[in-house]
Amino acid sequence: MGAPTLPPAWQPFLKDHRISTFKNWPFLEGCACTPERMAEAGFIHCPTENEPDLAQCFFCFKELEGWEPDDDPIEEHKKHSSGCAFLSVKKQFEELTLGEFLKLDRERAKNKIAKETNNKKKEFEETAKKVRRAIEQLAAMD
């Protein structure tokens, strides 16, 4: 019987899992932002057609793109999301106590809810603008 695996929601806490997301990452050897260093800084690679180097912190959900070979992932993370609790964790995942892990997971869940709420708010605001324009166009017809 093999070692138990973590539920998918917790796998990003593992550095090896984060490294595995960096397929087709443009910066490998001789660069500051290698997959290993990106993963150490908490990033996962989530490329899109228009943003092939898009990376997101699995913890605070901050997305960064436009990476340069000499960008330091930790410094970029601190610069763009200084309040990310992952940056202050001094232990490897495997060294955390259950209490420490659950506290981190609760913080991550709050971050995820905040990100999703913000996305829904933006989506609603965009829809509201379109509806307002349509109403104004209808009113102008009279």
UniProtKB/Swiss-Prot annotation:
It is found in: Cytoplasm; Nucleus; Chromosome; Chromosome, Centromere. Changing residue 70 to A: No change. Loss of interaction with AURKB. The record marks 126 as: Interaction with FBXL7. Keywords: Acetylation, Apoptosis, Cell cycle, Cell division, Centromere, Chromosome, Chromosome partition, Cytoplasm, Cytoskeleton, Host-virus interaction, Kinetochore, Metal-binding, Microtubule, Mitosis, Nucleus, Phosphoprotein, Protease inhibitor, Repressor, Thiol protease inhibitor, Transcription, Transcription regulation, Ubl conjugation, Zinc. BIR repeats lie at residues 18-88. Ubiquitinated by the Cul9-RING ubiquitin-protein ligase complex, leading to its degradation. Ubiquitination is required for centrosomal targeting. Deubiquitinated by USP35 or USP38; leading to stabilization. In vitro phosphorylation at Thr-117 by AURKB prevents interaction with INCENP and localization to mitotic chromosomes. Phosphorylation at Thr-48 by CK2 is critical for its mitotic and anti-apoptotic activities. Phosphorylation at Thr-34 by CDK15 is critical for its anti-apoptotic activity. Phosphorylation at Ser-20 by AURKC is critical for regulation of proper chromosome alignment and segregation, and possibly cytokinesis. One of its GO terms (cellular component) is spindle microtubule. GO terms for molecular function: cobalt ion binding; cysteine-type endopeptidase inhibitor activity; cysteine-type endopeptidase inhibitor activity involved in apoptotic process; enzyme binding; identical protein binding; metal ion binding; microtubule binding; protein heterodimerization activity. Changing residue 117 to A: Prevents phosphorylation by AURKB. Still able to localize correctly but prevents interaction with INCENP. Monomer or homodimer. Exists as a homodimer in the apo state and as a monomer in the CPC-bound state. The monomer protects cells against apoptosis more efficiently than the dimer. Only the dimeric form is capable of enhancing tubulin stability in cells. When phosphorylated, interacts with LAMTOR5/HBXIP; the resulting complex binds pro-CASP9, as well as active CASP9, but much less efficiently. This is Baculoviral IAP repeat-containing protein 5. It comes from Homo sapiens.
